[in-house]
A protein has these predicted regions:
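Specific aromatic-rich, kink-prone transmembrane helix
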Residues: 33
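Short gly/Ser/Thr-rich phosphate-binding loop of adenylate-forming enzymes
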Residues: 1-18, 52, 61
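Conserved lysine of the Walker
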Residues: 27
Length: 201
């Protein structure tokens, strides 16, 4: 599955009696979190864990991060598989003993980046393999895309690092405009500057 884009949620909400966003990889038996979508303002959260499921947001050293901080999304609980059939290396990489003190069992590293929002819901921000280092800063390309997707003038966005001249890497975002107008790069940069650090704009 893919993330539920804000513009699709906006289009669906008036047409359905209830809109639910469910998140979960096959390795955790399909769904792990759920959220009833009430509005399409901002990014669409993936919600809270379902029963018998635990969610952990971990840093690069497998420490839990506080709310608001981006980390790797890991899932534990009764629905978590024990590993991959005949793939011991991949199993060892993705299925680990729970590193949180007092918590037992296996957890699954999803490969997704996420953070816990102020209201306690989870926000998925893309893949960990979508993370780059540019000019000494670690940049989450998925977070840039998420912020662009929240703008009314943007239907869809993709952020990349492009190197036109050897050694001159830069952030580039490609967008599909929403509606008939096309937002200027100045307007987009100004909007991103309100929510992202300078090195990500």
């Amino acid at each position: 599955g893919e993330a539920l884009p804000r513009n699709l949620a906006e289009e669906l909400l008036p047409r359905v009696s209830a809109l639910w966003n469910m998140y979960g990889p096959t390795e955790t038996t399909i769904w792990s979190t759920i959220e009833r979508v009430e509005s399409a303002t901002g990014s669409v959260p993936i919600g809270r864990p379902i029963d018998n499921t635990q969610i952990y947001i971990l840093d690069a050293y497998d420490n839990a991060v506080p709310a608001g901080v981006i980390g790797g999304l890991c899932i534990g609980g009764r629905g978590t598989a024990l590993g991959y059939l005949n793939r011991p290396e991949l199993t060892a990489e993705r299925f680990i003993e729970n590193p949180i003190p007092g918590c037992d069992g296996i957890i699954y590293r999803t490969g997704d980046l996420a953070r816990i929002r102020r209201d306690g819901t989870l926000e998925c921000l893309g893949r960990t393999d979508h993370q780059v280092k540019l000019r000494g800063f670690r940049i989450e390309l998925g977070e840039i895309e998420t912020q662009l997707d929240q703008l009314d003038t943007v239907a869809q966005a993709v952020a990349i690092v492009r190197e036109d001249v050897a050694g001159d890497a830069r952030l580039v975002a490609y967008i599909v405009p929403a509606g008939t107008g096309e937002p200027s790069s100045v307007d987009l940069q100004a909007a991103l500057g309100e929510t992202l650090p300078d090195y990500m704009v």
